[in-house]
Amino acid sequence: MLLIAGLGNPGPTYAKNRHNIGFMAVDEIARRWGFPAARSRFRSLAAEGAIDTPQGPVRTLILKPQTYYNESGRAVGEAMKFFKLQPSDVVVFYDEIDLAPGRFRMKTGGGAAGNNGIRSVASQIGPDFRRARLGTGHPGQKELVHGHVLSDFHKAEMKWVEPLLEACADAAPLLALGDDEKYQAEVMRLAPAEKADPRKLAQGKPRGE
């Protein structure tokens, strides 16, 4: 079984925030692969279904923790324990300010790099889970990060957000088979984005963008 969790904050106030792109990604995966409506379970909105692969369907649980972003690990830990899963069975989708907008990277293990949601998951299940990092860009200065991640995507940004989410869903069979390297490559093939230093990109923007 595969457990796919998205990080985000619950409720309509936060729904379009950059911090909620993890929720957006798992919603698109659930929609693309015909998962049933989510229900309250494991301190989350949870939906169980399957992702079709060349080797057959892979049973998958999609989680949107309702604990608020920084406590997401409690939900992931409960579900993992219930299904007796290993960290390698868990994929967490989340926003990554240290990647340029639209960039996508898979990673297994490592530190939290200042992300409190990832730190929470690691505190519950250990660090060796799989991370799907969705680049949202950096505002350029540390003191601007909080406002940046808790602000909605601008309309212009949806030109890369929507293709990225669709690519994450369309390529999901590779994720379900555990081939994270090919999954990353296929997502970036379907939704290419320029590789750049997100802080330098921020410096080139007019104020207020």
Swiss-Prot record:
Please name the GO terms that the record assigns under molecular function.
peptidyl-tRNA hydrolase activity; tRNA binding
Q: Which Pfam families match?
A: Pept_tRNA_hydro
Q: Where does tRNA bind?
A: 14, 68, 70, 116
Source organism, top-level taxon: Bacteria
Where found in the cell?
Answer: Cytoplasm
Whether tRNA-binding counts among this entry's keywords is yes
- Enzyme class, one word? hydrolase
- Enzyme Commission (EC) number: 3.1.1.29
Q: Which residues constitute the catalytic centre?
A: 19 (proton acceptor)
CDD domains in the cross-refs:
PTH (cd00462)
Q: What keywords sit in the KW lines?
A: Cytoplasm, Hydrolase, RNA-binding, tRNA-binding
> Could you say which residues are annotated as the site Discriminates between blocked and unblocked aminoacyl-tRNA?
9
GO biological process assignments: protein quality control for misfolded or incompletely synthesized proteins; rescue of stalled ribosome
Q: Name one GO cellular component term.
A: cytoplasm
Q: Which family does it belong to?
A: Belongs to the PTH family.
Q: What does this protein do?
A: Hydrolyzes ribosome-free peptidyl-tRNAs (with 1 or more amino acids incorporated), which drop off the ribosome during protein synthesis, or as a result of ribosome stalling.
Q: How does it assemble?
A: Monomer.
| Protein name as it appears in the record | Peptidyl-tRNA hydrolase
Instruction: State the organism of origin.
Output: Phenylobacterium zucineum (strain HLK1)
